Amino acid sequence: MIIHYMYLLRLILLVFICITPVHGNSIYNLIKIPNLEIYEINTENRLKYFYAKSSFRLGVQKNIICENSNKDDLDNKYNLINKNLNKYSHNFLKKISLKYIVLCENLSIAGINTAGIPDNVMKTLILDIKFDHKYFERVIHHEIFHIINDSYKELFNEEKWTSFNNKNFKYSTCSTCSKKLGLDTYKHTNGFLTEYSQSTASEDMAEVFSHLIYKISKSKNDPILKKKETFIRNNISKIDKNFKF
């Protein structure tokens, strides 16, 4: 009788562990980011949202830093973020390896502020909810493209992309090596949507993708941009033929 009773207790404990939502260490085991708690896990496209309950540092040199936000700021930005990310179906997100969204503020890498940090290996996107409101929605999709690009490097060939530009144009070797940081959309594009588009090929692709998602097209009188938009559309359709811009 005692044996059966102990077995029953173990069974109840096992069931409790299985149905209890992930917290603290369990979240860390999932995505290797400390100090997180659940914000929302019951979403239309099954994305799981976490928030920083206290500041965290990441990376081998601990040079990725993000701070915790207050509840009002989280609540205000969550609806906006969720609205934008609901543009992506669960099927598409699964194909590009994105499952987790981390919300925090004052995100930086080696002292350089950034809107987001994508990690397709950990299926995670960290977003700075205090990033400039003027660009915030658009940069969400910019960061989504980096997840896509990292998951499908073979589709987004940078040499092919570079060939669309004027022959005398050269990108920087890295986005942080460039002083071209402006995010305002040009009135007169000449092959590039923003100053930041001119930093690297991958940033240029991300800017074109984010503008397409945000329903901003400047390619009518710009043959270079027309080629770039077609390239993005065609290769996204190879990932998911049902994807709609």
Cite the ranges covered by each PLM segment:
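Polar/charged alpha-helical tracts
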Residues: 29, 48, 79, 83, ...
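A general structural signal for short secondary-structure junctions and capping/turn motifs
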Residues: 3-7, 93, 195-196
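Active-site-flanking segments in enzyme catalytic domains
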Residues: 97-245
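Hydrophobic, Leu/Ile/Phe/Ala-enriched alpha-helical segments that form helix-helix packing faces
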Residues: 16-17, 81-92, 144, 148, ...
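Auxiliary, metal-adjacent structural segments of Zn-dependent hydrolase domains
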Residues: 59-121, 129
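Classical Sec-dependent N-terminal signal peptides that target proteins to the secretory pathway
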Residues: 1-26
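Non-catalytic architectural context of zinc metalloproteases
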Residues: 25-74, 103-106, 173-186, 219, ...
